[in-house]
Structures are given as C-alpha cells and as structure tokens.
Amino acid sequence: MKIDLNADLGEGYASDAELLTLVSSANIACGFHAGDAQTMQACVREAIKNGVAIGAHPSFPDRENFGRRAMQLPPETVYAQTLYQIGALAAITRAQGGVMCHVKPHGMLYNQAAKEAQLADAIARAVYACDPALILVGLAGSELIRAGKQYGLTTREEVFADRGYQADGSLVPRSQPGALIENEEQALEQTLEMVQHGRVKSITGEWATVTAQTVCLHGDGEHALAFARRLRSTFAEKGIVVAA
C-alpha cells in the first residue's frame, strides 16, 4: 500500500526544513495568506534537495486572517488570483531546475471549494490553464475533486490526520468544538482507519466513507514534527509506503 504525505509550508513556521525530510509532497504558500517571493524560493530549494514533490498553495487574498476568512468573490476573480499564484510558484520552481507537480488550495478557499461548485470550477479551470499535467488536491469526495475530473485533471483526494469530521465527510469548522484532534493516539488511529479502511468516525459517532490518497500534516501544530515522525514510523510498521 502507498500513501502520499503532504504538509503546508512557507507559512512562517520554523519546522519547514525538518518537515521536508518527512513528507512526500509540499504545498507552498504563494503570498496571498502567507509567504513571499523569498520564502517561496527557499521552500522550493529545500523541497528539491529532499526529493519532495512541489505544489502551489493558493489562497484568498487574506493575510490578516491567514486565509481563514470566508469570502464571496466572483468566479473570474478567483480564477485570475489562482492562476497568478500558481504561475508565480511555477516560475520560481522552474528557475531552480525543479518541476511543479500539484496544486492544493488553502484555508477557506479550500473549504468553500469543497462545497461550492462555481468556486471549484474556477480553481480547476485555473489549474488546467496553467498546466493540464498538474494534480489537483482537494477534500475527499468534494466539489473540487469533481471539478478537477470534469477538466480531465488528475485529482488527489485528501484526508486530515488532525481534524475532526462531520457525518457527511466534511471537516468540522475550526470555530466549532472537535475541529482539531490534539490527542496523538486518536489522530494516529483516525489516520490508519482512513488509509487502510477508507472510513472515518465523525464527531457524532457515525462512520463516513472517505478515499484517502494523501494525508495532510499541519506544520503549525505544537507537536507537528513529533507527530510526523510517529506517523512515518507507524506507516513503516504497517508496510505502508510514503510516496507522492
């Protein structure tokens, strides 16, 4: 069995370099919620050095709230902003002799695109316009995955090690209790259940079906590195290969 392990990087946390030795894919902030040209360049350099797949992590224009504020923007605006961010990271990657592999939206752009078909379409269209060979990463079973498939893109369905799930397979909003799983054992158990058995227990106790093609590790958690190491060793024990 094989699984991709991804992390959101270039967001101002000190653990980036070490996380890049543990993950197989990196989603690099493109300046709209965090990061700038120099952090993008540094992250790309480290990712290439570690053989990690490079991806763009576009966001709503919302540095003040770290891209976590809901926005209602016209689809054409989202298309242009997404294309702008993807293009910037693609150029920085190419200049260093690397190849950009995927795109994963950030924060509320990701969450809204999981449920809003027009927004999902705008993002998928931007990815396709930039490079039809790019992989589009989205929440398992979401509108974003459906939109990517409609454009003929390769999609990668994502699950979260440290997030609570609702009965419909969507994430518990960060503003609500149960959104974040702080207990390491619980997060490990949830991850293995999703990867090995394709299901996750919701905060209300029901099982939801999920397709786990990539697991997200949040680099901003207090114990991010320790958990990443634990997850890697657990995967190794279970014969699960980590690869993009």
Curated annotation (Swiss-Prot):
* SUPFAM superfamilies associated with the record: Glycoside hydrolase/deacetylase
Q: Tell me the GO molecular function terms.
A: 5-oxoprolinase (ATP-hydrolyzing) activity; ATP binding
**Record has Ubl conjugation as a keyword:** no
Pfam families associated with the record = LamB_YcsF
UniProt KW keywords: ATP-binding, Hydrolase, Nucleotide-binding
EC numbers for this chain: 3.5.2.9
List, alphabetically, the InterPro entries matched. Answer: Glyco_hydro/deAcase_b/a-brl, LamB/YcsF/PxpA-like
Instruction: Name the catalysed reactions.
Output: 5-oxo-L-proline + ATP + 2 H2O = L-glutamate + ADP + phosphate + H(+)
First-tier enzyme category under EC: hydrolase
What is any one GO biological process for this UniProt entry?
A: carbohydrate metabolic process
NCBIfam families per the UniProt record, alphabetical: PRK05406.1-1 (NF003812), PRK05406.1-3 (NF003814), PRK05406.1-4 (NF003815), PRK05406.1-5 (NF003816)
Described purpose of this protein according to its UniProt entry: Catalyzes the cleavage of 5-oxoproline to form L-glutamate coupled to the hydrolysis of ATP to ADP and inorganic phosphate.
Indicate the family of this protein: Belongs to the LamB/PxpA family.
Subunit structure of this chain's protein: Forms a complex composed of PxpA, PxpB and PxpC.
Which protein are we looking at? 5-oxoprolinase subunit A
Its source organism is Escherichia coli O17:K52:H18 (strain UMN026 / ExPEC)
